[in-house]
Amino acid sequence: RRGIRMEKLVYVDRRNTNCNKWDGQQKMFGEEGLHAMWVADMDFRVPECVVSALREYVESGVYGYYKIPDAYYQAFIDWEREHHGYEVKKEWIRFSPGVVAGFHWLLQILTEENDAVIVNTPVYYPFLDAVKNNHRNLICSDLKNENGEYSIDFDDFEKKITDHQVKLFILCSPHNPAGRVWKKEEVKSGFFEICRAHQVYIISDEIHQDLVFGENKHIPSLSTGEYDDIMVSIVAASKTFNIAGAQNSMVIIPDEKLQEKWDAYVKGNRVLGGNAFGYVAAQAAYAGGNEWLTLVLDQIEENYQYLKAELAEKLPEAVVTPLEGTYLCWINLEAYVRADEMKEVIQKKCRLAVDFGDWFGGERFAAFIRMNLATSKENVEIGVNALIANLVRK
Protein backbone atom coordinates (compact mmCIF):
# COMPACT_ATOMS: atom_id res chain seq x y z
CA ARG A 1 0.00 0.00 0.00
CA ARG A 2 1.41 3.38 -1.05
CA GLY A 3 1.07 6.71 0.70
CA ILE A 4 1.58 7.77 4.29
CA ARG A 5 2.34 4.88 6.62
CA MET A 6 0.23 5.02 9.76
CA GLU A 7 1.65 1.83 11.23
CA LYS A 8 4.92 1.79 13.17
CA LEU A 9 7.06 -1.16 14.18
CA VAL A 10 7.59 -0.93 17.94
CA TYR A 11 10.18 -3.05 19.74
CA VAL A 12 9.11 -4.18 23.22
CA ASP A 13 11.51 -5.26 25.96
CA ARG A 14 9.64 -8.35 27.10
CA ARG A 15 11.71 -9.15 30.17
CA ASN A 16 9.61 -9.59 33.33
CA THR A 17 6.33 -9.86 31.40
CA ASN A 18 5.82 -13.63 31.81
CA CYS A 19 7.31 -14.03 28.35
CA ASN A 20 8.46 -17.60 27.80
CA LYS A 21 11.37 -16.60 25.55
CA TRP A 22 12.86 -14.16 28.05
CA ASP A 23 11.45 -15.25 31.43
CA GLY A 24 11.00 -19.01 30.94
CA GLN A 25 14.52 -20.21 30.22
CA GLN A 26 14.95 -22.41 33.30
CA LYS A 27 13.13 -25.41 31.84
CA MET A 28 15.17 -25.66 28.63
CA PHE A 29 18.50 -24.18 29.73
CA GLY A 30 18.63 -24.76 33.48
CA GLU A 31 19.11 -21.06 34.18
CA GLU A 32 17.67 -17.62 33.51
CA GLY A 33 19.27 -14.43 32.25
CA LEU A 34 20.45 -15.54 28.81
CA HIS A 35 20.10 -13.26 25.78
CA ALA A 36 17.00 -14.74 24.15
CA MET A 37 17.12 -15.72 20.49
CA TRP A 38 15.18 -18.97 20.66
CA VAL A 39 11.36 -19.30 20.93
CA ALA A 40 9.73 -18.42 17.60
CA ASP A 41 7.74 -15.36 18.49
CA MET A 42 8.56 -11.70 17.93
CA ASP A 43 9.69 -8.89 20.20
CA PHE A 44 7.44 -6.44 18.34
CA ARG A 45 4.18 -4.90 19.47
CA VAL A 46 1.33 -6.37 17.43
CA PRO A 47 -0.54 -4.35 14.79
CA GLU A 48 -2.60 -1.51 16.23
CA CYS A 49 -5.72 -2.97 14.64
CA VAL A 50 -5.32 -6.01 16.92
CA VAL A 51 -4.80 -3.89 20.03
CA SER A 52 -7.87 -1.80 19.15
CA ALA A 53 -10.09 -4.82 18.50
CA LEU A 54 -9.04 -6.49 21.75
CA ARG A 55 -9.45 -3.25 23.70
CA GLU A 56 -12.97 -2.82 22.34
CA TYR A 57 -13.87 -6.39 23.28
CA VAL A 58 -12.34 -6.07 26.75
CA GLU A 59 -14.22 -2.84 27.38
CA SER A 60 -17.52 -4.55 26.54
CA GLY A 61 -17.14 -6.08 30.00
CA VAL A 62 -18.81 -9.38 29.06
CA TYR A 63 -16.85 -12.48 28.08
CA GLY A 64 -19.53 -15.14 27.85
CA TYR A 65 -20.00 -17.87 25.25
CA TYR A 66 -18.88 -16.56 21.87
CA LYS A 67 -20.51 -16.98 18.48
CA ILE A 68 -17.79 -17.02 15.84
CA PRO A 69 -18.69 -14.26 13.36
CA ASP A 70 -18.65 -14.79 9.62
CA ALA A 71 -16.22 -11.87 9.48
CA TYR A 72 -13.58 -14.03 11.21
CA TYR A 73 -13.71 -16.59 8.41
CA GLN A 74 -13.99 -13.94 5.71
CA ALA A 75 -10.91 -12.06 6.93
CA PHE A 76 -8.85 -15.24 6.59
CA ILE A 77 -10.41 -16.21 3.24
CA ASP A 78 -9.67 -12.73 1.86
CA TRP A 79 -6.09 -12.88 3.17
CA GLU A 80 -5.41 -16.23 1.50
CA ARG A 81 -6.85 -15.03 -1.79
CA GLU A 82 -4.95 -11.73 -1.79
CA HIS A 83 -1.61 -13.01 -0.49
CA HIS A 84 -1.46 -16.57 -1.80
CA GLY A 85 -3.91 -16.70 -4.71
CA TYR A 86 -5.81 -19.53 -3.06
CA GLU A 87 -9.58 -19.69 -2.58
CA VAL A 88 -10.50 -21.30 0.75
CA LYS A 89 -14.14 -22.14 1.47
CA LYS A 90 -15.61 -21.45 4.89
CA GLU A 91 -16.94 -24.99 5.23
CA TRP A 92 -13.40 -26.37 5.00
CA ILE A 93 -12.16 -24.49 8.07
CA ARG A 94 -11.91 -26.14 11.48
CA PHE A 95 -10.49 -24.81 14.75
CA SER A 96 -7.39 -25.83 16.65
CA PRO A 97 -5.81 -23.94 19.57
CA GLY A 98 -2.51 -24.08 17.72
CA VAL A 99 -0.76 -25.72 14.80
CA VAL A 100 1.05 -28.10 17.16
CA ALA A 101 -2.21 -29.23 18.76
CA GLY A 102 -3.65 -29.61 15.26
CA PHE A 103 -1.03 -32.02 14.02
CA HIS A 104 -1.15 -33.99 17.29
CA TRP A 105 -4.88 -34.49 16.76
CA LEU A 106 -4.44 -35.35 13.08
CA LEU A 107 -1.84 -37.97 13.99
CA GLN A 108 -4.45 -39.65 16.15
CA ILE A 109 -7.18 -39.27 13.50
CA LEU A 110 -5.22 -40.50 10.48
CA THR A 111 -2.93 -43.17 11.96
CA GLU A 112 -2.87 -45.99 14.50
CA GLU A 113 -0.31 -46.82 17.17
CA ASN A 114 2.98 -48.08 15.71
CA ASP A 115 2.19 -46.70 12.24
CA ALA A 116 5.18 -45.10 10.53
CA VAL A 117 5.24 -41.31 10.13
CA ILE A 118 7.89 -39.57 8.01
CA VAL A 119 9.43 -36.10 8.40
CA ASN A 120 12.27 -34.20 6.70
CA THR A 121 15.07 -33.59 9.18
CA PRO A 122 16.33 -31.25 10.47
CA VAL A 123 12.81 -30.23 11.39
CA TYR A 124 10.74 -28.30 13.95
CA TYR A 125 11.15 -30.52 16.98
CA PRO A 126 7.47 -30.73 18.04
CA PHE A 127 7.01 -32.86 14.89
CA LEU A 128 9.36 -35.40 16.44
CA ASP A 129 7.70 -35.16 19.85
CA ALA A 130 4.22 -35.58 18.36
CA VAL A 131 5.16 -38.81 16.63
CA LYS A 132 6.90 -40.26 19.68
CA ASN A 133 4.30 -39.09 22.22
CA ASN A 134 1.54 -40.72 20.19
CA HIS A 135 3.45 -44.02 19.98
CA ARG A 136 4.02 -43.89 16.24
CA ASN A 137 7.19 -45.00 14.47
CA LEU A 138 9.31 -41.96 13.57
CA ILE A 139 11.01 -42.14 10.17
CA CYS A 140 13.47 -39.37 9.25
CA SER A 141 14.43 -38.51 5.69
CA ASP A 142 17.26 -35.99 5.90
CA LEU A 143 17.28 -33.02 3.58
CA LYS A 144 20.39 -32.74 1.42
CA ASN A 145 22.72 -30.00 2.64
CA GLU A 146 25.26 -28.63 0.19
CA ASN A 147 27.20 -25.92 2.02
CA GLY A 148 24.03 -24.57 3.61
CA GLU A 149 21.78 -24.98 0.55
CA TYR A 150 19.01 -27.43 1.39
CA SER A 151 17.11 -29.63 -1.05
CA ILE A 152 15.01 -32.79 -0.90
CA ASP A 153 16.42 -36.28 -1.33
CA PHE A 154 13.40 -37.74 -3.09
CA ASP A 155 15.03 -41.15 -3.59
CA ASP A 156 15.60 -41.49 0.15
CA PHE A 157 12.12 -40.12 0.90
CA GLU A 158 10.37 -42.66 -1.32
CA LYS A 159 12.58 -45.57 -0.28
CA LYS A 160 11.84 -44.96 3.38
CA ILE A 161 8.12 -44.72 2.66
CA THR A 162 8.16 -48.11 0.96
CA ASP A 163 10.61 -49.77 3.37
CA HIS A 164 8.62 -48.74 6.45
CA GLN A 165 5.09 -48.72 5.00
CA VAL A 166 4.71 -45.09 6.00
CA LYS A 167 1.13 -43.94 6.59
CA LEU A 168 1.61 -40.20 7.13
CA PHE A 169 3.96 -37.40 6.09
CA ILE A 170 4.23 -34.16 8.08
CA LEU A 171 5.42 -31.40 5.75
CA CYS A 172 6.90 -28.15 7.04
CA SER A 173 6.19 -25.47 4.43
CA PRO A 174 8.01 -23.07 4.59
CA HIS A 175 10.60 -25.24 6.28
CA ASN A 176 11.76 -24.66 9.84
CA PRO A 177 14.73 -24.55 10.47
CA ALA A 178 16.20 -24.78 6.96
CA GLY A 179 14.41 -21.62 5.79
CA ARG A 180 13.33 -23.15 2.48
CA VAL A 181 10.24 -21.96 0.64
CA TRP A 182 9.43 -25.03 -1.44
CA LYS A 183 8.90 -24.57 -5.17
CA LYS A 184 5.74 -25.95 -6.77
CA GLU A 185 7.59 -28.73 -8.58
CA GLU A 186 9.24 -29.81 -5.32
CA VAL A 187 5.97 -30.23 -3.46
CA LYS A 188 3.65 -31.33 -6.26
CA SER A 189 5.84 -33.42 -8.57
CA GLY A 190 7.95 -34.56 -5.63
CA PHE A 191 6.36 -34.95 -2.22
CA PHE A 192 2.72 -35.12 -3.23
CA GLU A 193 3.04 -37.50 -6.18
CA ILE A 194 5.15 -39.88 -4.08
CA CYS A 195 2.60 -39.76 -1.26
CA ARG A 196 -0.27 -40.32 -3.72
CA ALA A 197 1.50 -43.34 -5.23
CA HIS A 198 1.96 -44.95 -1.81
CA GLN A 199 -1.34 -43.86 -0.23
CA VAL A 200 0.33 -41.68 2.39
CA TYR A 201 -1.65 -38.95 4.16
CA ILE A 202 -0.10 -35.45 4.28
CA ILE A 203 -0.30 -32.87 7.06
CA SER A 204 1.04 -29.55 5.78
CA ASP A 205 2.18 -27.14 8.50
CA GLU A 206 2.10 -23.72 6.85
CA ILE A 207 2.38 -21.48 9.90
CA HIS A 208 5.25 -19.49 8.32
CA GLN A 209 3.39 -18.95 5.02
CA ASP A 210 3.43 -15.14 5.24
CA LEU A 211 7.07 -14.82 6.30
CA VAL A 212 8.71 -15.09 2.88
CA PHE A 213 11.48 -12.95 1.36
CA GLY A 214 12.66 -11.75 -2.03
CA GLU A 215 11.30 -13.48 -5.10
CA ASN A 216 10.29 -16.58 -3.17
CA LYS A 217 6.59 -17.45 -3.20
CA HIS A 218 4.80 -19.76 -0.79
CA ILE A 219 2.68 -22.41 -2.51
CA PRO A 220 -0.29 -23.44 -0.33
CA SER A 221 -0.21 -27.23 -0.45
CA LEU A 222 -3.94 -27.58 -1.06
CA SER A 223 -3.77 -25.10 -3.96
CA THR A 224 -1.85 -27.63 -6.05
CA GLY A 225 -5.08 -29.61 -6.58
CA GLU A 226 -5.76 -33.33 -6.85
CA TYR A 227 -4.63 -34.22 -3.33
CA ASP A 228 -7.58 -33.12 -1.18
CA ASP A 229 -8.45 -36.70 -0.23
CA ILE A 230 -5.04 -37.28 1.39
CA MET A 231 -4.15 -33.78 2.61
CA VAL A 232 -4.92 -31.40 5.47
CA SER A 233 -3.16 -28.07 5.98
CA ILE A 234 -2.83 -26.02 9.16
CA VAL A 235 -2.25 -22.27 9.26
CA ALA A 236 -2.49 -19.53 11.87
CA ALA A 237 -2.16 -15.80 12.40
CA SER A 238 0.13 -16.52 15.33
CA LYS A 239 3.55 -16.43 13.62
CA THR A 240 2.58 -13.78 11.08
CA PHE A 241 1.21 -11.28 13.61
CA ASN A 242 2.87 -12.34 16.88
CA ILE A 243 -0.31 -13.55 18.60
CA ALA A 244 0.67 -17.10 19.60
CA GLY A 245 -0.67 -16.49 23.10
CA ALA A 246 -4.16 -16.03 21.62
CA GLN A 247 -4.18 -19.75 20.75
CA ASN A 248 -6.07 -19.74 17.48
CA SER A 249 -5.30 -21.66 14.31
CA MET A 250 -7.18 -22.97 11.31
CA VAL A 251 -7.20 -26.55 10.07
CA ILE A 252 -8.18 -26.61 6.39
CA ILE A 253 -9.93 -29.81 5.28
CA PRO A 254 -11.56 -29.72 1.82
CA ASP A 255 -12.37 -33.46 1.69
CA GLU A 256 -15.73 -34.43 3.21
CA LYS A 257 -14.56 -37.83 4.46
CA LEU A 258 -11.60 -36.25 6.24
CA GLN A 259 -13.93 -33.58 7.62
CA GLU A 260 -16.11 -36.33 9.08
CA LYS A 261 -13.10 -37.97 10.72
CA TRP A 262 -11.98 -34.66 12.22
CA ASP A 263 -15.46 -33.71 13.41
CA ALA A 264 -16.01 -37.06 15.08
CA TYR A 265 -12.67 -36.79 16.88
CA VAL A 266 -13.16 -33.29 18.26
CA LYS A 267 -16.73 -34.05 19.33
CA GLY A 268 -15.47 -37.09 21.19
CA ASN A 269 -12.96 -34.90 22.97
CA ARG A 270 -15.32 -31.94 23.37
CA VAL A 271 -12.97 -29.45 21.74
CA LEU A 272 -15.39 -27.51 19.58
CA GLY A 273 -14.00 -23.98 19.67
CA GLY A 274 -11.48 -21.54 21.04
CA ASN A 275 -11.60 -18.54 23.30
CA ALA A 276 -13.16 -15.29 22.19
CA PHE A 277 -9.98 -13.24 22.48
CA GLY A 278 -8.22 -15.48 19.97
CA TYR A 279 -10.94 -15.06 17.38
CA VAL A 280 -11.03 -11.29 17.88
CA ALA A 281 -7.25 -10.99 17.54
CA ALA A 282 -6.95 -13.22 14.47
CA GLN A 283 -9.85 -11.55 12.66
CA ALA A 284 -8.41 -8.08 13.26
CA ALA A 285 -4.92 -9.15 12.19
CA TYR A 286 -6.01 -10.68 8.90
CA ALA A 287 -8.32 -7.75 8.15
CA GLY A 288 -5.89 -4.95 8.95
CA GLY A 289 -2.36 -6.20 9.57
CA ASN A 290 -0.83 -6.07 6.10
CA GLU A 291 1.05 -2.78 6.48
CA TRP A 292 2.51 -3.90 9.81
CA LEU A 293 3.66 -7.18 8.27
CA THR A 294 5.52 -5.29 5.56
CA LEU A 295 7.47 -3.42 8.24
CA VAL A 296 8.23 -6.67 10.06
CA LEU A 297 9.53 -8.36 6.92
CA ASP A 298 11.77 -5.37 6.19
CA GLN A 299 13.23 -5.52 9.71
CA ILE A 300 13.83 -9.27 9.58
CA GLU A 301 15.52 -8.91 6.18
CA GLU A 302 17.76 -6.15 7.55
CA ASN A 303 18.65 -8.29 10.57
CA TYR A 304 19.46 -11.28 8.37
CA GLN A 305 21.67 -9.29 6.00
CA TYR A 306 23.53 -7.82 8.98
CA LEU A 307 24.09 -11.24 10.57
CA LYS A 308 25.18 -12.76 7.27
CA ALA A 309 27.65 -9.95 6.49
CA GLU A 310 29.15 -9.84 9.99
CA LEU A 311 29.68 -13.58 10.17
CA ALA A 312 31.10 -13.66 6.63
CA GLU A 313 33.72 -11.12 7.71
CA LYS A 314 34.46 -12.19 11.30
CA LEU A 315 33.60 -15.92 11.31
CA PRO A 316 34.02 -16.74 7.62
CA GLU A 317 33.73 -20.51 8.03
CA ALA A 318 30.34 -20.30 9.73
CA VAL A 319 27.74 -21.46 7.20
CA VAL A 320 24.60 -19.32 7.25
CA THR A 321 21.71 -21.02 5.47
CA PRO A 322 19.91 -18.75 2.95
CA LEU A 323 16.73 -17.33 4.46
CA GLU A 324 13.97 -17.79 1.89
CA GLY A 325 11.26 -17.91 4.55
CA THR A 326 10.59 -17.89 8.33
CA TYR A 327 12.49 -15.53 10.65
CA LEU A 328 14.70 -18.32 11.96
CA CYS A 329 18.33 -18.44 10.91
CA TRP A 330 20.06 -21.85 10.74
CA ILE A 331 23.83 -21.64 11.21
CA ASN A 332 26.51 -24.33 11.02
CA LEU A 333 29.33 -23.60 13.48
CA GLU A 334 31.28 -26.84 13.15
CA ALA A 335 34.42 -24.98 12.03
CA TYR A 336 34.55 -23.22 15.39
CA VAL A 337 32.88 -25.43 18.01
CA ARG A 338 32.95 -29.16 18.57
CA ALA A 339 29.43 -30.53 18.50
CA ASP A 340 29.74 -31.96 22.01
CA GLU A 341 30.81 -28.54 23.34
CA MET A 342 28.16 -26.49 21.53
CA LYS A 343 25.85 -25.97 24.50
CA GLU A 344 28.71 -25.12 26.83
CA VAL A 345 30.15 -22.53 24.44
CA ILE A 346 26.91 -20.92 23.25
CA GLN A 347 25.15 -20.88 26.60
CA LYS A 348 27.95 -20.48 29.14
CA LYS A 349 30.43 -18.37 27.18
CA CYS A 350 28.23 -16.47 24.71
CA ARG A 351 25.35 -16.28 27.22
CA LEU A 352 22.83 -16.90 24.45
CA ALA A 353 19.57 -18.84 24.53
CA VAL A 354 19.24 -20.37 21.07
CA ASP A 355 17.59 -23.49 19.70
CA PHE A 356 20.32 -26.12 19.56
CA GLY A 357 20.70 -28.20 16.42
CA ASP A 358 20.32 -31.61 18.03
CA TRP A 359 16.78 -30.68 19.08
CA PHE A 360 15.83 -30.81 15.38
CA GLY A 361 16.61 -34.46 14.78
CA GLY A 362 19.56 -35.73 16.76
CA GLU A 363 23.32 -35.55 17.15
CA ARG A 364 24.03 -35.24 13.43
CA PHE A 365 22.71 -31.66 13.68
CA ALA A 366 24.55 -30.79 16.91
CA ALA A 367 26.95 -28.41 15.12
CA PHE A 368 24.05 -26.09 14.25
CA ILE A 369 22.15 -23.40 16.09
CA ARG A 370 18.89 -21.66 15.18
CA MET A 371 18.61 -17.94 15.91
CA ASN A 372 15.39 -15.91 15.97
CA LEU A 373 15.71 -12.67 13.99
CA ALA A 374 12.24 -11.26 14.76
CA THR A 375 13.59 -8.73 17.18
CA SER A 376 15.39 -5.39 17.18
CA LYS A 377 18.59 -4.86 15.21
CA GLU A 378 20.29 -4.14 18.56
CA ASN A 379 19.33 -7.55 19.93
CA VAL A 380 20.66 -9.27 16.83
CA GLU A 381 23.90 -7.28 17.17
CA ILE A 382 24.27 -8.49 20.76
CA GLY A 383 23.83 -12.09 19.65
CA VAL A 384 26.17 -11.84 16.68
CA ASN A 385 28.87 -10.02 18.66
CA ALA A 386 28.69 -12.68 21.37
CA LEU A 387 29.41 -15.34 18.77
CA ILE A 388 32.28 -13.36 17.25
CA ALA A 389 33.84 -12.64 20.65
CA ASN A 390 33.75 -16.24 21.88
CA LEU A 391 34.24 -18.47 18.85
CA VAL A 392 37.67 -19.21 17.50
CA ARG A 393 38.77 -21.63 14.85
CA LYS A 394 39.25 -25.13 16.21
Describe these PLM feature segments.
Residues 63-193, 210-224, 228, 232:
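Conserved core of the PLP fold type I
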Residues 198, 215-238, 258-264, 352, ...:
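Conserved active-site segment immediately N-terminal to the catalytic lysine
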Residues 283, 300-308, 320-333:
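Conserved glycine-rich beta-strand-loop-beta hairpin in the small C-terminal domain of fold type I
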Residues 336, 345-353, 360-394:
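PLP-dependent enzyme catalytic core of the Aspartate aminotransferase-like
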